[in-house]
Amino acid sequence: LALPAVSQVIQDGLAFDAVVALNDRAAIGALAAIKENQLAMPISIYGIDGSPDMKVLLSTTDDIEGTVAQSPLKMGRQVMQVIECMRTGKSYKEQYKIPVEMIDKDNVDRYDVNGWQ
């Protein structure tokens, strides 16, 4: 979805110097649109997911600035704890904060490029 949307923005002549995408796939689509339309870099591109593809791009090119890694495992564990509280009638909080991590060129080597964070 990002490739045609970003292509349209470029063709409409709207100037931009950054893309913050909904997820890593969209960030990669935005990058493809920028390259396909031969827009001059640098344009800062960020994604969300900590996907293997984004980590490879981070470690091998200057095209991507970063990705925010969420932890589906931590989220799932928290959800299961809340479900258990609901099931047993125990109290639980309305909101939970689950930390995320910014992965960029300075720290991508600390993450496995073959897996999700």
Which residues fall in each region the model found?
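Short glycine-centered helix-capping/turn motifs at secondary-structure transition points
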Residues: 37-38, 62, 115
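Structural detector of well-ordered beta-strand residues that form the stable sheet scaffold
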Residues: 44-46, 65-68, 103
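Extracellular/periplasmic bilobal clamshell ligand-binding domains
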Residues: 54-57, 87
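Hinge/cleft segment of the Venus flytrap/periplasmic-binding protein
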Residues: 50, 71-117
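Short beta-strand elements at the ligand-binding edges of bilobed clamshell
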Residues: 60-73
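Hydrophobic alpha-helical
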Residues: 1-55
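Generic structural signal for alpha-helix termini and adjacent loop/cap motifs
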Residues: 12, 61, 86-90
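Short, well-ordered alpha-helices that flank and scaffold nucleotide-derived cofactor binding pockets
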Residues: 32-36, 60, 81, 85
